[in-house]
Amino acid sequence: MKHFMMPRNAILRDIGESQSPNPSLTKSKSQRKIKSSKENAPPPDLNSLIPDHRSSPAKLKSPLPPRPPSSNPLKRKLIAEATADNGVAIGVSDSGVKVIVRMKPPSKGEEEEMIVKKISNDALTINEQTFTFDSIADPESTQDEIFQLVGAPLVENCLAGFNSSVFAYGQTGSGKTYTMWGPANGLLEEHLSGDQRGLTPRVFELLFARLSEEQAKHAERQLKYQCRCSFLEIYNEQITDLLDPSLKNLMIREDVKSGVYVENLTEEYVKNLKDLSKLLVKGLANRRTGATSVNAESSRSHCVFTCVVESHCKSVADGLSSFKTSRINLVDLAGSERQKLTGAAGDRLKEAGNINRSLSQLGNLINILAEISQTGKQRHIPYRDSRLTFLLQESLGGNAKLAMVCAVSPSQSCRSETFSTLRFAQRAKAIQNKAIVNEVMQDDVNFLREVIRQLRDELQRVKDDKGNNPTNPNAAYTTSWNARRSLSLLRSFGLGHPKSLPNGDDDGDTEMEIDEEAVERLCAQMGLSPPAEDNNQEMSRVEKINSSLQTVVLKDESYNNSHLKSSEATDVNMEDACCQTENNGSETDNALTVAETMDDGSSVQPDSITNSLHSCISDTNQGNSPSKAENIPSCQDLVIEADVSAIVSVADTSNNTEQVSVNPVSPCLSVAPVSVSPVLIPPTESASPKIRNSRKSLRTTSMSTASQKDIERANQLTPEVVEPSPAMSTEVLNLYSALSTKKSEAFPVPTRQLAASLHRGMKLLDSYRQSTALRRSTFRLSYKALECKPSTVLSKADVGVQTYPQADEIAEDNSKEVLCSRCKCRAECDAQEISDTSNLQLVPIDNSEGSEKSNFQVPKAVEKVLAGSIRREMAMEEFCTKQASEISQLNRLVQQYKHERECNAIIGQTREDKIVRLESLMDGVLSKDDFLDEEFASLMHEHKLLKDMYENHPEVLQTRIELKRVQEELESFKNFYGDMGEREVLLEEIHDLKAQLQCYTDSSLTSARRRGSLLKLTYACDPNQAPQLNTIPESVDEGPEKTLEQERLRWTEAESNWISLAEELRTELDTNRLLMEKQKRELDTEKRCAEELTEAMQMAMQGHARMIEQYADLEEKHIQLLARHRRIREGIDDVKKAAARAGVKGAESRFINALAAEISALKVQREKEVRYFRDENKSLQSQLRDTAEAVQAAGELLVRFKEAEEGLTFAQKRAMDAEYEASEAYKKVDKLKRKYETEISTVNQQHNAEPQNPIESLQASCNDDAMAKYDEPSASDGDNQWREEFQPFYKKDEELSKLAEPSWFSGYDRCNI
């Protein structure tokens, strides 16, 4: 049994890959055989595929490159796929590493100790050992010679499209930095042309000169170059951006297309040598350097300067365009050093350790690459051991030309380091790099134009045949024959494969080796003959029939790429690849899907093919009629991946009948095969609404009044924003009318803007009220001049003379003629209010010119003030109307947002229903036709909703509101600051009020000086009764004191009236303040509502995103299931074919079928387990790395804990010592205190025991009489004197008692301890 099954495993794949006399079969099989290791890799040109006849007759091995080692598969992938990605023949350069050894000039004391000697241009000796390299530069060599050896070839390689790298290696102080960059000031502008310049400025000087020369030389090809540079350093295994030192500890990433790169690294474009010099100066200034005993400015880090040169050229003659990329890496490595020679300590010692470790890892990598190049034996390449090797892996054994400048010191003191450097250079010279030209050639434009022209002719011919012969009975056969011919035309142009697809990971793909000897041996054991040629011919015929029934898809190029990206990832055998064509800008975007149902190996059924193709093409031609054009939506409108803005194109396609006639039918009318799963349409991606270009312009006239502006605002806003468009369906109109009855739709204006506008409105209201209150108080002191009645000059106190009823009637008539009804009503109310509150009247008796002039000026000024107040009141009402309209618009936007939210909920429900339908279709519950009908109805309903949301988008209304408000503000500013605007009127009113006040002040002062009181203040008890006028005699009989007292009483009453008026104003101010607080609370409520709406919208968007992710996971699982089923079926078919060829029949055939099914299931299960174990291995490796990092962090933390514990123990010990010392000090103080108290008590006892002082006794004996009187007082004085002498001791006793208590600094010391 074992011998029976083993050969079968080798023929599970392509049993028909043996030699076939049929050339078409050989061509198709060779195409499958030469397929790249990448599933998504673009196939090479069909005309350039030549079968490989170098394989042995025993085994036909796959021409795929050998699988890369498991350590770094990506490195080898990039090299293996370079040819396939470019699409053209790429020049390959198989060259080794170029090594140049440069000897440092010896110092004065080292001239006699030189141990390195140059014996030829490419050889040197050290300790009687000879080393051979590409070139040797002796100590007398100049910078220009090094440039000619390394820099000039590097520039030419860069222009040719190769990647190039230059490494500077050697011990510290050997001249690496000088070779690469030159002296410290060599990069400045004044030193750019000196002889001491380094390799880098010379390289780029030549590079920019050659770029200019090439551009001028190939100007007809539109050749353009572009250079971008980056500069980084690797210090202590951390990458820092030298152009932006704030970017530290950058991470290295790896990508299939771009390879290895540093994340977030700064790249700057340069155009000339001056720009590049600035970058070099800036980067080298930020590089880490330090002083050692060997080198005063030793580099403490590796630095890498990278320049990417991109060129693009296009040939006008043949339409070919090429894109060439080359990368230049200039690497200045830190020098190796020994602690004995450099005397490094502290940070320098740590840096030296990291540098030596990094160089050791580089040397290990060089050894492995040299061994691989010499022996050809594959082994693990440790690129990831250090940041330097991981970053520069393309330069070391990859796609680059490498030149290495090894700097050595010929002195005896550096013998070991020099010898180590030369051995490193010798091993590096053995490395073999494979540099290729990084060039991408695009397809021939003229060829594609010819293809498009022929395809157009074919399509037009098919349409003409169908239109000219509508009743021809042979039309179905002709149509199917035309479809076959069109398919052959497409295949002849080579459009059956995608032009370019991204490369995928080929991990897990295995290519089987088909052993023909084992097949023949199996046939001999079973007594069967080998496969005959007639079977091969039959298989070729079946292959032809299957290939002729492929699906023809005409789509947009971008959508085709994205579709093939997902579909080709699931196909194992690309037998049924989609045919693709490229469209010009005016070509169709829709798709025609034609597919037939047919079992493998069966004959062709012309009737089914004819019927299906006939139905598809007839549906296509029916789209020419304008009446049905509206019922056939374009594929662009039904494909969910399209932009939301493209949905509006339904109306355009309904009017454009020519476009509808060209476009094929939508995918919902296509016939899908039974054996192929239906194409799953992904859900709509949620896109936040964005304001594009507003085509509405709201213009206001500067001469329109407030009422006219209100009317225009109401007329403009309603029809443009609120009314639905005629293209909306009846259902959407009903829904819109139901929603419009509640509140207006609104989209919230930004919170800060709304708050600012309301705050500005409140300020205007406050200023208006304050100015109104001030004007009212001024009016009430204007002595009845507010009625706009002309004043009369009176010489006598005659009441009848002063009333002037005719003048009053004339004034009233004039006011009626000038003022409108609204202003007249407001003026009458103000006049009535003023008449109610005013109690003062002016009774002029002087006939002088000043009095007459002032009496006529007063009414004019008051009229102007009154007109200004009315005008400002109207402006405020207009402002309030604007605010009310804005509030209504905001409410309308809120309602509209609610409607959009409901539409989103409906769309989400549609997505869920779609998922349910897909699951039902997969389970077989729902038939394919029902699924297509329900899907079409769902898409049409969703299209209506999206169209409704597009036509009534909230942000459109918001934009209009913003534009209207800005225009109104601009208009108000123009009206205020313009000629004869509000500003001029206000200035004129202020001037009139000042003149009026000055008039009253002057008249009152002059009358008081001449005749005393000229004002007669009367008080009216009845508000409606006119105040009485009293005559004032010419001569004053009463005394001045009585007159003054009367005037004082009158002014006191007037002052009380003013106080009551002030109280009323204060009450009104409080009311307004309460109203403002209420409005502020309402504003806060609106803000909270807006925030809640925003949060709800965000939650809805997040839910929609989660729904899309779930659908994507479901679709991925579905695709995986289909791929697994397809692989099982292919395995069964292969085994059936092998059994049919071997002639197995009857029971053996059933056994073979069962065995094939089991083998296929086991194979799929094994692949699944392999993928599972691979993923688990990766996860375990990542967990292991995380665990190692955690263990390292825990070790560091444990060390810190131990240090902290030692510090704590030491602190506790110090605290105990301090407490012991403090207790001892307390004991000493107590002891001293007791001793002192004992001494004090002894002295007091001795003092009390002695009766008197000896001196006093002698005086008493001399003067008995005198001392008899003063005996007792002298004794008391002596006692007091002794007490005074001992008083300091008592004070010290008190201080000691104080010291006995715990001092303030004892606790402080404890805290510090």
Swiss-Prot record:
Keyword field: ATP-binding, Coiled coil, Cytoplasm, Cytoskeleton, Microtubule, Motor protein, Nucleotide-binding
Positions bound to ATP: G170, Q171, T172, G173, S174, G175, K176, T177
Chain positions covered by the region annotation Microtubules-binding: 298-302, 331-337, 380-384
Record note on disruption phenotype: No visible phenotype. Kin12a and kin12b double mutant display defective pollen grains leading to the production of fewer seeds.
Ranges in coiled-coil conformation: 932-1003, 1062-1130, 1167-1241
GO CC, alphabetical: microtubule; phragmoplast
Region annotation (Neck) ranges: 429-467
Kinesin motor domain residues: 96-431
Lineage: superkingdom: Eukaryota
Chief localization: cytoplasm
GO BP term (any one): male meiosis cytokinesis
Function of the molecule: Plus-end directed kinesin-like motor enzyme that plays a critical role in the organization of phragmoplast microtubules during cytokinesis. Constitutes a signaling module in association with serine/threonine-protein kinase TIO that is required to support phragmoplast expansion and cell-plate growth in plant cells.
Descriptive protein name: Kinesin-like protein KIN-12B
Species whose genome carries this gene: Arabidopsis thaliana
Source organism phylogeny: Eukaryota, Viridiplantae, Streptophyta, Embryophyta, Tracheophyta
